Amino acid sequence: VDYWESNYESKGDYIPRADLGGPEAFKKGVAAVHARGGKIILYLEAFIVTRKNPVGLEHPDWAMMDENGSFYTYYGRDRFYLMYPGEGSGWTEYVCGLAEKMVRDYGVDGFHLDSYGCQWDWKDYNPKHPGATDPAKFNKGAVDLVKTMRERIRKVNPDAVVILECCERTELLDVCDGGQLDAAAWLYSPIKVLNEKPWVKEKKY
């Protein structure tokens, strides 16, 4: 069930749907799952927002641009912004604050950050983001985003977790609670895909 306003593709503010009872019903649903011994891990986009979502409308200045000064598209579609996590952008503060608020207000147990385990080496040409053409700036910002989110939600709930979709970068794995193989891996051989990761032989995780 898509439980955010206004639909699945509206990524950015994550407001529980009014026709399903709104925030209060969502909170009660989480409590009911907890009463049965379950946990609620929310899907959250840390990389993209919908351009027509209130967050996208208000803060295109947080998004990354290509070398021609145009906003990056996402798989060829221009309905999303790709958000920059470094200096000059308020994205990290916003999304980490949002995660903290959802743990506090709804009692959720953590977040699954879609695709964030493989977002790496982006070059950003947005002039509002100093030095962002250096991919190292994005990389540091991505690590800081995951680390900050985990620290903030654990101040509210010490057992809260941050899980990443994809598990390509040890720098990101070092600051989260777990990684999920990318969805495509399940179409053929998850074990083969896992064993191809450069860090598997180190037996670090």
Residue ranges and their predicted role:
Residues 1-6, 105-109:
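Catalytic domains of carbohydrate-active enzymes, especially glycoside hydrolases
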